[in-house]
Structures are given as structure tokens and as C-alpha cells.
Amino acid sequence: MKILVVNKKLHFNYEVLEKIEAGIELKGVEVKSIHLNNANISDSYVIFKRNEAYILNMNIAPYSHGNIYNVDPLRTRKLLLHKNEIIKYQMRIKKESLTMVPSKIYWRKNKLKVEIALAKGKKQFDKRQTIKDRDNSREARKHIRV
């Protein structure tokens, strides 16, 4: 499993409850561009329409050696999930007011996969508390070493 793109803002902005693996429907030049690490998933999220899952705001830069087949970098891309998974997560998102955010893109058995995190958004004071906890643990480790 080779990880290509990681959402570094995920654990700062969200509290992750569960992670799901999904396939993604891409064009050929998009796959080549992702392989060159020319993708950004930090602002992207998942929506459901007509019992299908789509990922929005996933920025895949145009392939440098591409031609007329280059597509819109921010186009909506379909996620490949089983129907029962879609229904299950759709109901859970509505009931618990959660969101689905991509956490990383990687290769698995010569296919690109997206790991999607079922998460709850953090408030501003939660983010501040996370920073304080991280600084306190860093200080504690520093004192242990000395």
C-alpha cells in the first residue's frame, strides 16, 4: 500500500469516529496526476445524491503532459461504495449530524482507493484544547529526557 495524498488538517478540524475504504471514479490523466502527488484533499468532503456518494472540492492538478483529455481540477467525482454502505452512512450522517471527509489516497492492488473518515467537526475551543494538550505532552516529554 503506497500512500500518495494525506489530509493533514483532518485530525485538527475533526474528531474521527470511523474510517471507510472506497474506490473512486477517475479519468486516466487524473490517475497520472495523482501518481505524481498533484492532488489536494484538505478542503474536500463527501455528499450523497440519489443514493450515490460523491466527493467535492478534491483538487487534482491538470496532468503536465496531458492533452485535450485534461478535465476540470475541481470536478465532482463519484465514490464506489456498496448500496448498503451508502444507505447506512447516509442515515448515520443525518441522525448524528456528522460529516464524511477523505483522509488519504493510496494504491491497493493496482487500484486507487480513498480512505474516508466519518467525523464530527470540532469547535474553536476544542481546537485550542487540542493545541494545549499537544504542547503539554511535548513539555512532559522534554522534562523526561532531561
Swiss-Prot record:
Keywords of the record: Cytoplasm, RNA-binding
Record localization: Cytoplasm
Keyword ATP-binding in annotation: no
InterPro entries for this protein: SmpB (IPR023620), SsrA-bd_prot (IPR000037), SsrA-bd_prot_CS (IPR020081)
Chain segments carrying region Disordered: 127-146
Record field: compositional bias (Basic and acidic residues): 127-139
GO-annotated molecular function: RNA binding
Broad class of where this protein is predominantly found: cytoplasm
Gene3D superfamilies: 2.40.280.10
GO biological process: trans-translation
One Pfam family linked to the record: SmpB
Entries under SUPFAM superfamilies matching the protein: Small protein B (SmpB) (SSF74982)
One CC-aspect GO term: cytosol
UniProt superkingdom: Bacteria
Translocase recorded as keyword: no
Entries under CDD domains matching the protein: SmpB
Function text: Required for rescue of stalled ribosomes mediated by trans-translation. Binds to transfer-messenger RNA (tmRNA), required for stable association of tmRNA with ribosomes. tmRNA and SmpB together mimic tRNA shape, replacing the anticodon stem-loop with SmpB. tmRNA is encoded by the ssrA gene; the 2 termini fold to resemble tRNA(Ala) and it encodes a 'tag peptide', a short internal open reading frame. During trans-translation Ala-aminoacylated tmRNA acts like a tRNA, entering the A-site of stalled ribosomes, displacing the stalled mRNA.
Similarity comment: Belongs to the SmpB family.
NCBIfam families, sorted: PRK05422.1, smpB
PANTHER family for the chain: SSRA-BINDING PROTEIN (PTHR30308:SF2), TMRNA-BINDING COMPONENT OF TRANS-TRANSLATION TAGGING COMPLEX (PTHR30308)
Name this polypeptide is given: SsrA-binding protein
Species this protein is from: Malacoplasma penetrans (strain HF-2)
